[in-house]
Amino acid sequence: MKLAPINIKNKRATFDYELIDTYTAGIVLTGTEIKSIRLGKASLVDTFCYFAKGELWVKNMHIAEYFYGSYNNHAARRDRKLLLSKKELNKLERGTKDAGFTIVPVRLFINERGLAKVVVALAKGKKQYDKREALKEKDDRRDMDRMFKR
């Protein structure tokens, strides 16, 4: 039995931030966490990344408790370590310290080998008027599509 592909997205990330550069990172999970992700029970809303002791961690990622788990079940919103190469970690850390960027998880997926991966992006926060402008363009595009369908 093959499960449907898991592709959990952070829709707010593209609206609130201008994504500069993306990286695919592995994530350290427990057994019940990966089972919940395979069932699609995860959320990236209000999730962000931070550095601690030279390692990249993701905070506020919600992975629901596994329904069939016992007393060994995981905490839903614990901090989880991300796995990147040293070169990528240095580049991300430099970007956050020097340029004032932030690191935002954009997507959580399971690759062809069955491993959970997180796509993180070096991002710059958008101003309120940029967000309004993006919404206006989206509405205009939608109206144009409606006009051409008729």
Curated annotation (Swiss-Prot):
Localisation: Cytoplasm
Listed Gene3D superfamilies: 2.40.280.10
InterPro entries, sorted: SmpB (IPR023620), SsrA-bd_prot (IPR000037), SsrA-bd_prot_CS (IPR020081)
Keyword Transmembrane helix annotated: no
A GO molecular-function descriptor: RNA binding
Keyword RNA-binding: yes
Family: Belongs to the SmpB family.
Functional note: Required for rescue of stalled ribosomes mediated by trans-translation. Binds to transfer-messenger RNA (tmRNA), required for stable association of tmRNA with ribosomes. tmRNA and SmpB together mimic tRNA shape, replacing the anticodon stem-loop with SmpB. tmRNA is encoded by the ssrA gene; the 2 termini fold to resemble tRNA(Ala) and it encodes a 'tag peptide', a short internal open reading frame. During trans-translation Ala-aminoacylated tmRNA acts like a tRNA, entering the A-site of stalled ribosomes, displacing the stalled mRNA.
Protein name: SsrA-binding protein
